Structure formats: C-alpha cells, structure tokens
C-alpha cells in the first residue's frame, strides 16, 4: 500500500511537471529549443520559417575564421572595414590579431570586426562562400548568407532550426566556446563586455550570440549546460528574448528531470515534444 501511495505521488508530480512544461508562451515569431547532444527538438515555433537573423550570423563567421586563420596572425585595418551598426571601434591603420577581432566579433558584435576577419579569410566574397559551404556541411538546409556581419539582405536568411544546428556545432569548437562564454575581455589594449546578459543571469549559460536590426528585430542564440545536459535555444524576432530564453530553459530542463524520474520508477512516459 505504501509503495502504491509513493508511486501515485510521483506520477502526480510528473503530471504537474508535464502540464507546466507544455504551458510555454513566448513572444518570438520563430523559436527552437534543442538538445545539443542528440539534436532532439524539445520545443518549436515556426522552426522552418526563413527569417533575417542579424548578428547571430557572426557565429558562423567565427567558425569559418577559426577553421582557416591562426589566432596570432594580424590584420591591418583599412577604411573598407568600417561599417554601420555595432562596432569594436577599429581605426584604419592599426594592426589587430585575429584573436582580438574574434572577441570584438562575439562580445562587442563588431560589424567592423566581421569585415576585418573576412579580410583575413581572403576577402568578403571568399569568406561568405566558406560560410555557405560550412552551413551546408552542418546540415543547415534552409539557410543562405551573403555577408559576414548579418546586416539585412534579400539573400541572407536562416531558420530557428538551422541556427540551433549551428549553435550545437559551435559548441564543439573549444576556442569559440572560450571566447563567447567570456563576460568581459581585456585584449589588444581594449576592454570588451559581452552583450549576452544570460551569461550573468542564467545558471550554466555558456554564451553564444545576440543580434538586432530594425528589420530582423531582436535575435538571440544561447546555450546552457546543467548536470551533463546541454540545451540550445534560438529565438527570432523576439522583443522579450531574455525572458523567453529563461522560460525555454526552465521548460527544457524540467521535462528532462521528469523523464528521468519516470524512468527511475520503471515507467516509459514520453516527456519530449
């Protein structure tokens, strides 16, 4: 009898967790929550809608640079590297290491850093070609990029699902992860603070990338690791992105915990979408 009461209590708790998890309400036009290790989608909202992704593009730019450039190599900044929008405030004539530019790209979201790094890859056009090749290798089947900084373009788009695939791939690159998880960097005579508030506000956040243009709205890619599980969240065109990412992680990790408890009780409940 006692065992039955315990089992009933556990099942009631699992039911409440499931009900709570299903009640996800976020503001994003498109979103995905993915298990980075398995690729399983835990939550989705318009996951395959082609959308502008703004500076979250820079995740892909950084990965291309890390595949083709040495961190200690330098780039001489020119007037052509000056760009509208967010900046790490490069000055024509200065020489900056690729590593410093990567911090400027991923923390300060510098559009100037993106163009300078593209130069290190042979120029903007070769860099963009490499970005699209890498996107294809990753399995981003509904994406196309036409610049390294994420500024709006008719042929520059991705989906929440594809961006989650990109983030999961990026987690396997230790240098990328080291840089994007840094809250404040002092490098190359500069101090740069990461735009990603989740690093300071969400337990286990490992970073990733923010983005914004007027047309794209707010875009955000993030990742969180807890007790050996890593989840990736993507929201596109989301004016409430910080709160929505917290909601998605609470949802995702709660469902994972519920599934584990069910397994421990010998039940085969399905707690994933």
Task: Label each residue range with its predicted role.
Residues 14, 42, 50, 72-73, ...:
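Amphipathic, positively biased hydrophobic alpha-helical segments used for protein targeting
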Residues 18-161, 165-172:
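Active-site-adjacent loops and short helices of periplasmic peptidoglycan-processing enzymes
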Residues 140-141, 152-273:
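Domain-terminus/edge residues, biased toward the C-terminal soluble/receptor-binding domains
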